[in-house]
């Protein structure tokens, strides 16, 4: 898929004089001058990282800052992410992306090998969603802006969705939502960066893991361990789907001096943190965890405030990495095409 554009990126600005005719333009290429100016801005706002004691405070109290965030904003800050089904078909009902025969064959295949091993473990140690045939987990679920669209749109009777966040406030907001159903979903508090914390499901049991603007909130020194732990939960053929902040995104360039924790890692005014990735950063993390690249694409988007005649350059990265199959069967699991 290298070089092939994914589903986003269908509105191109060919005539700069038309920039204010739409709210956003996709796949906007930067000039050398823009790239140089962005690099200079990052150098300026990163020249003096915060003292180590302050960095440790933000690390040790990370969940508290996110609790405060969700206490203030509840479910009003983020919009539901219905665009996910266009970008990541793996989150839709399997019947909507496969023929009936293919779907049945995929389910039969999943009962072989690793799936049988998981089911034997189910009998000995039952876990939430043990009887499901397709399991999705979202890490850093917040108040459910990804989880609930999945539950609403994916009617697969074999689906079970896990969602976790290290903010207990966020998890309680998920559980109190009228769309939350324990028969189809299990929400739990979990710090994915803590290697001592255990997951409620066994290894090799998940088909899809979703990371939407989540990995960037984790200390870069802990990211490799996080991805490796998550990789161990995937079935062969399962995948991790990611969308996150890219290097020189508008949000990075807006940071003032005194907010930098480490190279390309910052703390916001509310105490929450954010890292800005390159494609190579993410490729190294996933490949080192034993996963194979299906997609690793930069989404450079020009957002426009037509009322104020302002332009804002956003940079996001979208990835799909797959756990290698243990057999030559390629049906089911995550698509590599």
Swiss-Prot record:
SUPFAM superfamilies: S-adenosyl-L-methionine-dependent methyltransferases (SSF53335)
InterPro entries per UniProt: Methyltransf_12, METTL2/6/8-like, SAM-dependent_MTases_sf
Catalytic activity annotation: cytidine(32) in tRNA(Thr) + S-adenosyl-L-methionine = N(3)-methylcytidine(32) in tRNA(Thr) + S-adenosyl-L-homocysteine + H(+); cytidine(32) in tRNA(Arg)(CCU) + S-adenosyl-L-methionine = N(3)-methylcytidine(32) in tRNA(Arg)(CCU) + S-adenosyl-L-homocysteine + H(+)
Main location group: cytoplasm
A biological-process GO annotation: tRNA methylation
Amino acids binding S-adenosyl-L-methionine: 66, 70, 140, 165, 191, 212
A GO cellular component annotation in the UniProt record: cytoplasm
Keyword terms of this UniProt record: Cytoplasm, Methyltransferase, S-adenosyl-L-methionine, Transferase, tRNA processing
EC number: 2.1.1.-
Subcellular localization: Cytoplasm
GO molecular function, one term: tRNA (cytidine) methyltransferase activity
Keyword Amino-acid biosynthesis recorded: no
Pfam families from the UniProt entry: Methyltransf_12
Keyword tRNA processing: yes
Quaternary structure note: Monomer.
Annotated PANTHER family: METHYLTRANSFERASE-RELATED, TRNA N(3)-METHYLCYTIDINE METHYLTRANSFERASE METTL2A-RELATED
Function statement: S-adenosyl-L-methionine-dependent methyltransferase that mediates N(3)-methylcytidine modification of residue 32 of the tRNA anticodon loop of tRNA(Thr)(UGU) and tRNA(Arg)(CCU). N(3)-methylcytidine methylation by mettl2 requires the N6-threonylcarbamoylation of tRNA (t6A37) by the EKC/KEOPS complex as prerequisite.
Family recorded in the similarity comment: Belongs to the methyltransferase superfamily. METL family.
Name of the featured protein: tRNA N(3)-cytidine methyltransferase METTL2
Gene: mettl2
